[in-house]
Amino acid sequence: MRALAAVAALLLAVPAAAARPAPPAVFTLKTGASGNPYLPVAVKNATLNIRIALSFDTALILNQAPATRAGLKPFPFLGKRTFKNAMIPGGEATFRFNLASITPAGLPPKKVPAVWVSRAIADDADGILTVGALKADRIDVVMRDTPPGSQTLILKKNGSGETGITTRLGDEEIDISLELNSPTTVMNARAGAALVAAGLARRANAVGYWRPFPGVALPWQRLEPRAGATLLGLPLRQLGSRVSESEARRIAAAARGTSTDSDDADTITVSADRRKKRGREPWILIGRDVLDDCSRISFDRANERWVLTCKFS
């Protein structure tokens, strides 16, 4: 959604507020029963229950009703747009934008781009906020007590406020994110093709569904990882590579989802003449199939890295 990114960039260009007290060195979050961390966040006139995500960039994304309770108003002229995309619940929704001052419980306030959507984007919370928006030098997401024999894995991330990690497979540069809200590891078609070409996985005749938002079911083809295969030191386990509905029907005749063959660039690998790559840049979301073996995941802003404490079975 390039238009959405452009609006967010415009909002971030607003002059910064006066200097505030230094953020804490370490801030700790604990995951709930769903496997995600949550935090009360004051947004204008309301305190909202917000899921803290590991894989978004700096933005607050809200359901419509909580945004109304908070008294948010869209930015003049550019603050309301309708988008169509397979990733959107129902395939189409109205997005409203503005810059909002938020105060997460226990942390200093911060101004972030706020986006509220006419269709529900979270059914377990009022909205979603990236861990990168929390003002602390390090944020520890604690999932359980650390068992004996655990190892520490360090993953360099892209920049100070960013959450993404970049690696290379063959001639593809792949964006990698950690995602506690996904039970499996999901990727787009170009990333899946890169894993297969590198000999790390093979395609299986099975289809599953990625459900990133309520009412969204996007088909993927299962990839079987090679025994012992890893990526950035993380084991490859339950893998799904995005496919179109027509591809899903070919793989499994009973496959049904909410996406269409059009407007779904995550399912495109290479153009018909094989000379020019199409679709979105390759990306992989590392899900709970891997991250459930971690007892602690730390967003280390000061050292621009992720630190994972895990005991892989």
Name what the model sees in each region.
Residues 5-15:
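Bacterial N-terminal signal peptides
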Residues 18-313:
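Pepsin/retropepsin-fold aspartyl endopeptidases
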